[in-house]
Amino acid sequence: MKNHGMNPYLPSWEYVPDGEPHVFGKRVYIYGSHDRFAGYAFCQNDYVCWSAPVDDLTDWQYEGIIYTRAEAAHNEDGRQCLYAPDVTCGPDGRYYLYYALNETSAISVAVCDTPAGKYTYYGDVHYPDGTTLGARPGDEQQFDPGVLTEGKTTWLYSGFCPPLMPGRTGALCYRLTSDMLTVEQTYPAVVPGAQTAKGTGFEGHAFFEASSIRKVGDTYYFIYSSELSHELCYAVSDSPCRGFVYGGTLVDNADLGLCDTARYFTGNNHGSIEQINGRWYVFYHRHTNSSLFCRQGMVEPIEILPDGRIPQVEITTSGPNGAPLPAVELRELPAYAACNLYMTQPPQVNAEAGQNPFPYITQDGADVMPESESKPEAYICNLTPGTVVGFKYLNFQNVTKVSVKTRGMCYYGGFDVLLTADGEPIGTVSAARGNEWTWQTTELAIPDGISAIYFRMKGYGTLSLAAAKFH
């Protein structure tokens, strides 16, 4: 299912956040939770898996449902949701899926003979006496497991540390035996939470949730969501269970840290890094539909420097492609591929979006599964004067016309076109007015070369934007 290498890397109607990427054989598999479009809570759908060839991150294949809420232990009434999982290949060559339910402090495990087959419940992580991890007096909440198998040893990381919640120490670490369930050793928190981070290198970026672990050479990288929630950070150590030192921010889903103000609407973040065909990437997610519960997977190339540091990367449209997108060769540039969406003027209220005054990415139609014959179209709604829609990066060659597909009631409407967020417009494109989607083409030469492009709305009223074309 090719998408020209644009973010989000899965189809616009798919909502798989918390992505843990793992290369098994010649494919990279994504294991995440599964949001429901227009849902009322996190992770309401069953676990699904998508995969792509390691040499083509534009060609994602739906592998199917791999585990359902109905199959999960401790969920007899089906009321609980499957929260963020992780998968590891065990010493026996089978694949083990570690997960937690939203209201149960336990890490459960399901197993499968293949990376993306039907997983079956295997058991709960437990102490040697059989007591479930998380059930002993004094145990902290088990949440967001991350796993790494080395030989016959599996390292399990877990934890949930809201900054104001008492009794939470940080990211928890456990060594498991070769049965993949029994705790052989427990360790003090490897990364402190906000209540214990004062005076450490983690202060201001303490552990919140989203444990993930990778080994790069001889160095262990612990990836996590910080107390700020919208950034993924990393810590490094030469040991999997102690000595982690704060490294920095990998990615922020609003580009904070790289920009003084948010370039997208912030929300929680979860993901990890993976080496794919010799190149390293960070997987993370963004929020859509003006909701915490409609999250989509994103990916960017990263660079691990010789000293082990990983500079923060910006969120882009072209991340999966690993290079700027060819502007003219794209049939069209969908609006949902915008990596920047923000306002420079006070918001207005759009009747189409009820009382929400902010622009956001949404879709026409209900939540769908890949098997559905018809798929909803995604677009940006609630654009008001001063709203900026940005795409990074495109390779422009011989562009003399720009078209936009819009609908809405906007008078004297259109978009100033900019090549830098704070630069001067290189021209203006007109937008059609009406309740039906309509293309409007304007003659506008864009200089040859690699650039971002921004559409800043002007006029009076509101618009929705579905796509742009470059001719």
Give the positions of each predicted feature.
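Carbohydrate-active catalytic/glycan-binding domains of CAZyme proteins
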Residues: M1-H471
